[in-house]
A protein has these predicted regions:
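A conserved beta-strand element that flanks and buttresses the S-adenosyl-L-methionine
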Residues: 3
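A short His-aromatic
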Residues: 9-10
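A short glycine-rich, Lys/Arg-flanked "PGG" loop and its adjoining helix->strand segment in the class I
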Residues: 15-30
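Alpha/beta-hydrolase-fold catalytic nucleophile elbow
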Residues: 34
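Residues at alpha-helix caps and immediate loop-helix transition turns in enzyme cores, especially N-
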Residues: 13-14, 93
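Short catalytic micro-motifs in class I SAM-dependent methyltransferases
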Residues: 6
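Substrate-binding/catalytic lobe of Class I Rossmann-like enzymes that use SAM or dcSAM, i.e.
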Residues: 37-149, 155-156
Length: 156
């Protein structure tokens, strides 16, 4: 069995990826995938200009798959089941992360200073805050029915 949680969004060549995943499975092996999706439109995360901070700092090189995108790559893995979940729960999660980082600002700043350096920690603290707010807004949009969470179960 293979389980992937929120990783496939950072990939683009799904045909090659699914072939590789299939090669790791025994015959009859299962692959469970949890991903974020847009209801109908896949789109790439590519930096378009200096203001495109989410593509640059959080999803560089990745893509937002559409809900049906994984179904087009069944050469090596066959879909057994698919589930779609409202984005409302992820909206709640992103808002909880925002509250948590605000309540633990000193601890967060310490970690961010270690990772990004003292000169960049404040900037990264704000980037993370805006990221959480943006995610909450996206996944809550249209009552959670535009950007969603999708689960897929494939079999080799």
């Amino acid at each position: 069995r293979i389980v992937s949680v929120e990783m496939i969004e950072h990939m683009r060549n799904h045909k090659k990826l699914f072939k590789k995943i299939s090669s790791w499975l025994n015959p009859g092996g299962l692959f469970f995938m949890h991903i974020f999706v847009h209801k109908t439109q896949p789109y790439l995360f590519e930096v378009q200009d200096k203001d495109d901070w989410m593509s640059k700092y959080f999803f560089s090189g990745g893509m937002m798959p559409s809900e049906d995108l994984p179904l087009f790559f069944q050469e090596d893995l066959k879909i057994i089941n698919q589930w779609s979940w409202s984005g409302k729960q992820y909206e709640n999660t992103a808002n909880a992360w925002l509250t948590n980082i605000d309540l633990n600002k000193n601890k967060a700043m310490s970690v961010l200073e270690e990772i990004y350096g003292e000169n960049n920690a404040k900037k990264w603290f704000q980037r993370w805050r805006i990221f959480f707010m943006s995610c909450a807004e996206l996944w809550g949009y249209k009552n959670g029915n535009e950007w969603k969470i999708a689960h897929y179960l494939f079999k080799k």
